[in-house]
């Protein structure tokens, strides 16, 4: 469960290391984001000479959350960290590589490019 002021690790090679959530997209009163939801964030930590700089406002899709999520078959999935992948306005990832596993919920939300780049889908 990601909300405003949550910090997330960036799981791609855009050069950003950490982002701060400033808005959860999808409705005026929407409070929380889970795996597969889109957020607006600002870059808090970035590598020097990268494509994104500290302070840039970016869109990202959440790929891992510490809060467990119940699946339709009754199982639960949770990860060790909160992580996101930076995306363009069309929904395509800005980076060319994804690090770490991603949730299967991304397939339901039609983020096929992220699914294909990810080393593991849980």
Swiss-Prot record:
CDD domains listed in its UniProt record: Ribosomal_uL14 (cd00337)
Keywords per UniProt: Ribonucleoprotein, Ribosomal protein, RNA-binding, rRNA-binding
Name of the protein described by the UniProt record: Large ribosomal subunit protein uL14
Quaternary structure and partners: Part of the 50S ribosomal subunit. Forms a cluster with proteins L3 and L19. In the 70S ribosome, L14 and L19 interact and together make contacts with the 16S rRNA in bridges B5 and B8.
Gene Ontology cellular component list: cytosolic large ribosomal subunit
NCBIfam families in UniProt: rplN_bact (TIGR01067)
Gene: rplN
Function: Binds to 23S rRNA. Forms part of two intersubunit bridges in the 70S ribosome.
Taxonomy, superkingdom: Bacteria
Organism encoding this protein: Parafrankia sp. (strain EAN1pec)
Entry's Gene Ontology BP terms: translation
Family, per entry: Belongs to the universal ribosomal protein uL14 family.
Gene Ontology molecular functions: large ribosomal subunit rRNA binding; structural constituent of ribosome
């Amino acid at each position: 469960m990601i909300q405003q002021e949550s910090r997330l690790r960036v799981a791609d090679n855009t050069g950003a290391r950490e982002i701060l959530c400033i808005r959860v997209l999808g409705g005026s009163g929407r409070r929380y984001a889970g795996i597969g939801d889109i957020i607006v964030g600002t870059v808090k930590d970035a590598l020097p000479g990268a494509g994104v700089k500290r302070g840039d406002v970016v869109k990202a899709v959440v790929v891992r959350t510490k809060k467990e999520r119940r699946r339709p078959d009754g199982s639960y999935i949770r990860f060790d960290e909160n992580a996101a992948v930076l995306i363009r306005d069309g929904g395509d990832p800005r980076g060319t590589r994804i690090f770490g596993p991603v949730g299967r919920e991304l397939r339901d939300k039609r983020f096929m490019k992220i699914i294909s780049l990810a080393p593991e889908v849980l």
